[in-house]
Amino acid sequence: MLRKQTPGRARPADVEAVAAVSALGKVMNQDGTALDHSKVRKRESMLPTRGRSGRGGVRRASAESAGRRTRSEDGKAARSARERHMEDEFNAFGGRATAGVAKEVPARGGADDGPVMTTKYVPSPRGLVKVTVPVSAGSSAHSSLRKSASIHTGMNMRHGSGSRRASMTSAGSDAARRQAKSTAESSSARTRSNKPKPRPSGDSHSPSPTTRAPVTPRRTTVKDLVAPPLPEEPEDSVSTSGKGESIVPLNEKEEEQDEQPFDSEANARSSPKTPKQGGHVPALEVSQHGFQTPVPDGPTMAEYLQSADPILSAGATQRQRELEEAEAASTTPDGDRLKIGKSPSPMKSAMKNSPSAGTSKYNRPPLDTSSAADGAYLSLTTAENTRLNAQLSDDKMRKSPTLRQPKRRVSVHSPKTPSAASADRSSKVLRQFSLSKPQGRTLAMNKNNSGEKQAQSPTSPKSNQKKVDPSVLYPREPPKKKSSFERERPQHKNLGFKNLSLRSEASNEFMYQGTLEGEIHQSPGQHVGHETPKKALLSVTAEGWKSRFSDSDSENDSPPFSSNASGSTQPSSHRDSSLAHHGGFGLFKHKDHHGHKPKHSLGASLASAKPHEPQKARLAPTSNRGSNTLSAERPLKNHNSFSGKLKKLFGKKHAT
């Protein structure tokens, strides 16, 4: 049901619309000016039966079809009333016969007043121009026929009347061709004259649309170029008779323009204030009138344009004034000319400073060039220019013209040097030294290139580095540390604690080297000096100091001190005893007042064990006795200073 209702509701609107349009077309007469409303109503009354027969209304006698018919009839009545209103308004403006480009306007006074006139819109350089042209009865019939054919074209295609459509379109095309010819002639005449024709006194009440006006000349211009000229008809003669007054002077003016093409163009440019009006444009007449009285032996075109244009005339007067000044300058005496030629600044040319240098060269008479004064002037200016060019070519002048100032300062101070007092000699030497530096710089800049300057800059720090000893600048690198928990140690060092020693290797090697140097470089008469550290150590142990490494459980270690007096000659026993009892380092601090840092204990033990060695003996061994005797006095001072540092750190005096 739904599928059948949807197309059934859409069909009646299309069929009824087509039927209404066809009824309106058949009711209209040929001119399309009036409608017989009685015929329209009869046609509308016939439309429902035609619509019902078209869609099979006999078989559908249900309530839905009856309701659909009532709705369609109501809509059709409203639509017909709307269409009647639109047709009445359309006929009030002239109907379908006057809807094209050409529009027939009936004469007001009747048929006896004159021929039927028609208004046309013709394109011109200034836009569309409205023209009234007389039209014969045949052309009006053709135009009305063409309009009716354009109206009924859609209808004939639906009803299948192809032969009638072809005949009507052919007749309409003939009428269009004739009308196009007349419009093309009028448009070409207007483009040549560049002025519109005078409008007639009678105004038309029915305006025509301007949308179709540009379409007609486009089609006609192409046909005019291709088709041969057709023989003139009586209506064309009538139309040309109306145009006769404007065409005849046009040809005469064209001939005059061909005779003088350049003058008219120049005059058109030189007279910008040409009046532009819609009806009459007298531009060509004014231009021709201006050239009717030419001057036979007058100025040229350029001079004429200069006189016409105020800007060019002002420039010409200024140029004439400059020429007069140049002539006046060329007649000045030679003495004044030499004064003018002198240049205040050395960087400019002497020829450029004189105002008459450029103009007198061309405006000077030929007899004046052979005078002796001019030759002397030229020679002087040439010599001046040569001298200036030589200064510019100098490298010192081009690169750094301000570097000559220090030399002038030296020359100013030089006569004062012999008369200066002795108190000012030091300041004078400093001043001369400061002045000699820029002089050396100027010589280096003039002699050396930029590459040599860069080569000199890195050489200066190298010479300074050679003088300074690198051992002073950088400290000695300590030896590589080994793990203190190594079980296998080298036997040649003979360290006191071989099993898991917590002592650093660097301190052991340092102490070992110091003892070896002291024993090797000592003479045999100095054995008493070796026993002094043992006595010091015995005094320390007598006071109650004990090493935490000398334990009863240690089996490998030797007793702290042997009763042998010859222990001083054995470096191994002396070294073991000194390391075991006095040079120990611990991870844990003693809580008693005797415990102190390993650094200070090491320094104190070294200072007390070797009083005969200076601190410098650790780096370089001493070979002579004089140095040993002198160094024996120094450790006391070092010991006192070290104990003072301990007092400051701990606030207690340690017995050493």
From Swiss-Prot:
This protein's record includes keyword Iron: no
Predominant subcellular localization, coarse grouping: membrane
Keyword list, A-Z: Cell membrane, Membrane
Bilayer topology term: Peripheral membrane protein
Compositionally biased spans, kind Basic and acidic residues: 66-88, 477-491
Domain of life: Eukaryota
Region of interest: Disordered: 28-95, 135-375, 387-656
Stretches with biased composition (Polar residues): 351-372, 433-463, 557-572, 621-631
Compositionally biased region (Basic residues): 399-411, 588-600, 645-656
Compositional bias of kind Acidic residues: 253-262
Location of the protein in the cell: Cell membrane
One cellular-component annotation, GO: plasma membrane
Biased composition (Low complexity): 136-150, 182-191, 206-219
Family: Belongs to the SEG1 family.
Complex formation: Component of eisosomes, large cytoplasmic protein assemblies that localize to specialized domains termed MCCs on the plasma membrane.
Its job: Important for the stabilization of eisosomes, large cytoplasmic protein assemblies that localize to specialized domains on the plasma membrane to cluster specific proteins at sites of membrane invaginations.
Protein's name according to its UniProt entry: Eisosome protein SEG1
